[in-house]
Swiss-Prot record:
The lineage of its organism: Bacteria, Bacillati, Bacillota, Bacilli, Bacillales. The gene is yuzB. This is UPF0349 protein YuzB. It comes from Bacillus subtilis (strain 168). Pfam families: DUF1450. Belongs to the UPF0349 family.
Length: 78
């Protein structure tokens, strides 16, 4: 079972699309997009994604990708 990375379409429009494009190239991740993840305050503040149900944020797409991989390393699923 791969880690699940979920993006909000509104946050993609705010800049996290670049992070999504990078993460989608990793065959060890399941990357999904939803209309809304109901994290509107977080969405307005910074780029974010849900990683296995937990919020991970970054100020830039590169930082978001780095933070997602760090989160996955520090929180193994098994």
């Amino acid at each position: 079972m791969n880690p699940m990375i979920e993006f909000c379409v509104s946050n993609l429009a705010h800049g996290s699309q670049e992070a999504r494009a990078i993460l989608e190239k990793d065959p060890n991740l399941d990357v999904l997009e939803y209309g809304c993840l109901s994290y509107c305050g977080t969405c307005m503040e910074s780029l974010f994604a849900l990683v296995n149900g937990e919020v991970v944020m970054g100020e830039t797409p590169a930082e978001l990708v780095e933070n997602i991989y760090t989160f996955i390393e520090e929180n193994p699923m098994f």
